[in-house]
Amino acid sequence: MNRKNIAKGKLVRRFGVNIFEQPKYDKLLKKKPNAPGMHGRSRRAKITEYGKQLIEKQKVKFTYGVSERQLTNIFKESRRQHGVTGDNLLALLERRIDNVVYRAGFAISRAHARQIVSHGIIMLNGRRVTIPSITLRANDMIQVKEKDRLKKLVRSNIEKTSTLRKLPTWIEVNADDLNVKITRPPSRDEIPTLANEQMIVEYYSKRA
């Protein structure tokens, strides 16, 4: 196991949930259910309300691979929108182009999806993009660049991920043409997150 996987493994154990949605971390949690450095029943000392909020915020931060500044800005945007702030926050994270590439099965992980976008492999509405943080809207279309080598890579990823995760109902994936259409924003019950978004809202609201 390389250093990056070890670091991810420690995060999964710290949070007690498989935030990276990969089978190997489910196995790790079964084998080592305690947080790093903790053993037996004393998994964690009593956590303050602030500590709980911080943990939920960190879960989302590491799940989606965003920086502190990015998450703060996403929260500010979610608060400006109509509706429930926590729901808006998660929907904005889900509609990031790197996350859509991941959800569509074009990448085996979100980190891999960010790499794919950064390398210019993805087209957005016919134009090459290299910014993983772009927020997609209804009727946006993303497509794999017209190169046989790239298409072969993505098709291989689709094959690997097809049995591991279900496609979201708010996107339409054409596996033959390797494109994805955003049909609408996701609703809260369509977002498979392991974090408590209300605690994240409370965390940022106290610092606004």
Swiss-Prot record:
GO CC term, one of those recorded: small ribosomal subunit
Keyword Nucleus: no
Pfam families registered for this protein in UniProt: Ribosomal_S4, S4
Coiled-coil zones: none
GO molecular function, one term: structural constituent of ribosome
A GO BP entry: translation
Record flagged with keyword Transcription: no
CDD domains named among the record's database cross-references: S4
InterPro entries, A to Z: Ribosomal_uS4, Ribosomal_uS4_bac-type, Ribosomal_uS4_CS, Ribosomal_uS4_N, S4_RNA-bd, S4_RNA-bd_sf
Keywords of this entry: Ribonucleoprotein, Ribosomal protein, RNA-binding, rRNA-binding
Domain S4 RNA-binding intervals: 95-157
Domain of life: Bacteria
NCBIfam families given in the database record: PRK05327.1, rpsD_bact
Record-stated family: Belongs to the universal ribosomal protein uS4 family.
Subunit annotation: Part of the 30S ribosomal subunit. Contacts protein S5. The interaction surface between S4 and S5 is involved in control of translational fidelity.
PANTHER family referenced in this protein's UniProt entry, alphabetically: 30S 40S RIBOSOMAL PROTEIN, SMALL RIBOSOMAL SUBUNIT PROTEIN US4M
Function: One of the primary rRNA binding proteins, it binds directly to 16S rRNA where it nucleates assembly of the body of the 30S subunit.
HAMAP family reported for this sequence: Ribosomal_uS4_B
Annotated protein name in UniProt: Small ribosomal subunit protein uS4
Species assigned in the record: Borrelia turicatae (strain 91E135)
